[in-house]
Curated annotation (Swiss-Prot):
Belongs to the AKH/HRTH/RPCH family. This is Adipokinetic prohormone type 2. The modification Pyrrolidone carboxylic acid is found at residue 1. It comes from Schistocerca gregaria. Adipokinetic hormone precursor-related peptide (APRP) can form three type of disulfide-bond dimers: p1 (alpha-alpha), p2 (alpha-beta), and p3 (beta-beta). The keyword Ribosomal protein does not apply.
Length: 39
């Protein structure tokens, strides 16, 4: 979970990052929120 957080931060800050990877991370975060396990 911590590794995923740092990877997400890097992608979020890099405008040249892979958009599909960005969307995948975003979807994973939303899924965690919906399941009540955001943190």
């Amino acid at each position: 979970q911590l590794n995923f957080s740092t990877g997400w931060g890097r992608r979020y800050a890099d405008p040249n990052a892979d958009p599909m990877a960005f969307l995948t991370k975003l979807i994973q975060i939303e899924a965690r929120k919906l399941s009540g396990c955001s943190n």
